[in-house]
């Protein structure tokens, strides 16, 4: 699942007010998006395990 301490990773980009943490190298590495709810687009397979609220 998502790293519960993802907010300690560096903010590498901000897209429409949403912070992106970790590695952001599209199209292969998309990082973890969000602050209140985090979505790891590198782990997400639509089963909900990529969301940390």
Swiss-Prot record:
Keyword Transmembrane: no
Residues bearing PTM N6-methyllysine: 29
Molecular function GO labels: 3 iron, 4 sulfur cluster binding; 4 iron, 4 sulfur cluster binding; metal ion binding
Chain intervals for the UniProt region annotation (N-terminal extension): 1-35
Keywords attached to this entry: 3Fe-4S, 4Fe-4S, Electron transport, Iron, Iron-sulfur, Metal-binding, Methylation, Repeat, Transport
Co-factor binding details: Binds 1 [3Fe-4S] cluster.
Cofactors: [3Fe-4S] cluster; [4Fe-4S] cluster
Residue ranges constituting the 4Fe-4S ferredoxin-type domain according to the UniProt record: 34-53
Residues bound to [3Fe-4S] cluster: 44, 50
Role of this protein: Ferredoxins are iron-sulfur proteins that transfer electrons in a wide variety of metabolic reactions.
Protein name from the UniProt record: Ferredoxin B
Organism: Sulfuracidifex metallicus
């Amino acid at each position: 699942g998502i790293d519960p301490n993802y907010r300690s990773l560096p903010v590498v980009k901000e897209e429409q007010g949403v912070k992106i943490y970790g590695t952001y190298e599209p199209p292969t590495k998309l990082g973890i998006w969000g602050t209140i709810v985090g979505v790891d687009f590198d782990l997400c397979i639509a089963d909900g395990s990529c969301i940390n609220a």
